[in-house]
From Swiss-Prot:
<feature type="compositionally biased region" description="Basic and acidic residues">
    <location>
        <begin position="60"/>
        <end position="74"/>
    </location>
</feature>
<feature type="region of interest" description="Disordered">
    <location>
        <begin position="51"/>
        <end position="84"/>
    </location>
</feature>
<dbReference type="InterPro" id="IPR014229">
    <property type="entry name" value="Spore_YtfJ"/>
</dbReference>
<keyword id="KW-0749">Sporulation</keyword>
<protein>
    <recommendedName>
        <fullName>Uncharacterized spore protein YtfJ</fullName>
    </recommendedName>
</protein>
<dbReference type="Pfam" id="PF09579">
    <property type="entry name" value="Spore_YtfJ"/>
</dbReference>
<dbReference type="GO" id="GO:0030435">
    <property type="term" value="P:sporulation resulting in formation of a cellular spore"/>
</dbReference>
Length: 151
């Protein structure tokens, strides 16, 4: 069976989209600054693709007179396809001698990252509270023992 005309449309559109896509689309090419830091752009990438077509009514299949085999007749076809790409920079990844930093362009949307950044400090505070609580309990037990000895 021959390829359907819409396959050609889809193949062409997908090949063109594929040419636009590479790893540098999301993580940009590194830029080195004079102080030795390296800056990478982090982008949000969105792709869209659509294809459609229609076959119009044609003549019914005809029989050959010599060997009575039916031959397939191609119906008239109309179709189209399209695609689009949206690339939006969302952050810069800065790698320098002081460490790695993520500089977001929209600070309001990164609540989870802020929570993760605060997690070590929060855990440390919780540990300190437990240590104080254990220390207070042990002091309270010692005080109770002392009170029991005095009676």
């Amino acid at each position: 069976m021959a390829d359907h005309p819409i396959q050609g449309l889809m193949k062409t559109a997908m090949e063109n989209l594929k040419e636009m896509i590479d790893v540098n689309t999301i993580i940009g090419d590194p830029v080195e600054t004079p102080d030795g830091s390296v800056i990478l752009t982090v982008s949000k990438v969105g792709f869209g693709f659509a294809a459609g077509g229609s076959e119009f009514g044609g003549k019914p299949a005809e029989k050959k007179s010599e060997d009575d085999e039916t031959r397939e007749q191609k119906l008239p076809f109309g179709g189209g396809s399209g695609g689009g790409v949206s690339i939006t920079p969302i952050a810069f990844l800065i790698v320098g001698s002081t460490g790695i930093r993520m500089l977001h362009l929209d600070e309001n949307t990164h609540l989870i990252e802020k929570i993760l950044d605060a997690a070590p400090q929060t855990l440390e505070r919780i540990q300190q509270m437990f240590k104080k609580n254990n220390k207070n309990q042990s002091q309270g037990q010692n005080q109770n023992q002392m009170n029991n000895m005095n009676y």
